[in-house]
Amino acid sequence: MSQYVICALYKFVALDNFEALRAPLLEVMEKNEVKGTLLLAREGVNGTVSGTREGMDALLAWLKSDPRLADLSYKESYDENIPFYRTKVKLKKEIVTMGVEGIDPKRVVGTYVKPQDWNALITDPEVLLIDTRNDYEVQIGKFKNAINPNTETFREFPDYVKSNLDPAKHKKVAMYCTGGIRCEKSTAYLKELGFEDVYHLEGGILKYLEDVPQEESTWEGECFVFDNRVAVDHSLNKGSYDQCHACRMPISAEDMQSEHYKKGVSCPHCYDKVSEDQLRRFAAREQQIELAKSRGEEHIGSEAAKAIKKRQAEKKLKRKNYHQHLTQGAE
């Protein structure tokens, strides 16, 4: 088994003291060398983190010791490397940003559909299947016959619904996302608008890929994930996509053959959208990344900070020894 556990977790629950949870949560993560980002808001917790089995178990035990989070939803996958550089806990207005006041998945939400029942639902000709993710995510993988709303952010989803969906016309609507959290809000939003039969994939794409054998699957392509793996395949292993360090878009092997691709600087998605100053900064950053790699170090994050401190200490010791040598030679 791979050395590191990657855990995507969330829970919609009233956390009136969410600000006070930040410091102890960050302390637990740092103590157990768990990296990644967790978001805290009055409406709950959300994020993806990674660490050793022992570290993740310690974090989950701490979270679940709070009765409000005892049944939080989480999904695990594994990799040889931790796909994050830093450890962060952020305070937010929403744990997933839709930007619509009054939407509360704790009060009303769509019907959860288990992964093993999903295929039967979405092959029903009366069901409208919608991917609630961003366009760049949909481009690298989706369920067969799913509609792409072509949104750049989740904030745009309500406008898509208002312009394209009608409760009187669309009697059955099924939606899905990466891990389930966006669908908690999107189905709650549709229910508030008067849509009656609204369904969503419990646990999201990641749970479907885990539970449904590939030979029975209706999933096409890979699944984008918000960490350094970029995407995962049907076995939840790191996929074939890389990421442009300039625009953060997923890039394929074909993209990297483009004349517009320059590692760490530009890709076919962004080459005509960046300034000369940005290109120079991206090129300088890529040089620093390659320099760090040549030393066997990370270029950012806590490990990079440790490496810098170590080099500084070594230089200081070297200077001290040099001055001692000069002093002894003069005596």
Curated annotation (Swiss-Prot):
Gene3D superfamilies per the record?
Answer: 3.30.70.100, Rhodanese-like domain
Q: Which UniProt keywords apply?
A: Oxidoreductase, tRNA processing
Bias type Basic residues, positions: 307-323
Which SMART domains does the record cross-reference, listed alphabetically? Answer: RHOD
Q: Which domain of life is it from?
A: Bacteria
Work out whether the entry's keyword set contains Oxidoreductase. yes
> What Pfam families has UniProt attached to this entry?
Rhodanese, UPF0176_N
EC number(s) reported in the record: 1.14.-.-
Tell me the Gene Ontology biological-process terms attached to this UniProt entry: tRNA modification
Reactions accelerated catalytically: uridine(34) in tRNA + AH2 + O2 = 5-hydroxyuridine(34) in tRNA + A + H2O
Q: Which residues form the Rhodanese domain?
A: 123-217
Q: What class of enzyme is it?
A: oxidoreductase
Family classification: Belongs to the TrhO family.
Protein's name in the database: tRNA uridine(34) hydroxylase
